């Protein structure tokens, strides 16, 4: 029985770790912590849109769209258990990050961003949750590629 639900432990463990880390870094940022270097600055920006401030014209309505999308993904994953079992850590990271950004939208009116990468070019300001979402998508893609290769090898 315990082995059957191991993926739930991994999902919620990743969810809580990413959520807590993102909120902790955001709390340091909101408390005024700043740092500058040649490549990366820790600063403060409030993003009222999504990536690269897209959809910021939706203003406060964006948080309800964000809530609906996260809700649909939660329902879909718990309905499609095989997908959740296969990618439990990645989806835990993704949803922990998404819920952390959603909390920001309700509390601060936008998402708290702090990392500004600026060596040779000015990249968008981002946060820990954004990094975790990108890592989780990369994990899912890598797992799917290796799963397909393993399946193809068995057919040979």
Curated annotation (Swiss-Prot):
Keyword Protease set for record: yes
Pathway where this protein functions: Protein modification; lipoprotein biosynthesis (signal peptide cleavage)
Top-rank lineage group of the source organism: Bacteria
Catalytic residues (positions): 113, 130
Primary site of residence: membrane
Catalytic function, reaction form: Release of signal peptides from bacterial membrane prolipoproteins. Hydrolyzes -Xaa-Yaa-Zaa-|-(S,diacylglyceryl)Cys-, in which Xaa is hydrophobic (preferably Leu), and Yaa (Ala or Ser) and Zaa (Gly or Ala) have small, neutral side chains
GO cellular component, one term: plasma membrane
Protein's GO biological process: proteolysis
Places the protein is found: Cell inner membrane
GO molecular function, one term: aspartic-type endopeptidase activity
Pfam families reported in the protein's UniProt record: Peptidase_A8
Record's bilayer topology term: Multi-pass membrane protein
UniProt keyword list: Aspartyl protease, Cell inner membrane, Cell membrane, Hydrolase, Membrane, Protease, Transmembrane, Transmembrane helix
EC number(s) per entry: 3.4.23.36
Keyword check for Cell membrane: yes
Membrane-traversing stretches: 5-25, 64-84, 89-109, 122-142
Family membership noted in the UniProt record: Belongs to the peptidase A8 family.
HAMAP family referenced in this protein's UniProt entry, alphabetically: LspA
Function: This protein specifically catalyzes the removal of signal peptides from prolipoproteins.
This protein's name: Lipoprotein signal peptidase
Phylogenetic placement of the source organism: Bacteria, Pseudomonadati, Campylobacterota, Epsilonproteobacteria, Campylobacterales
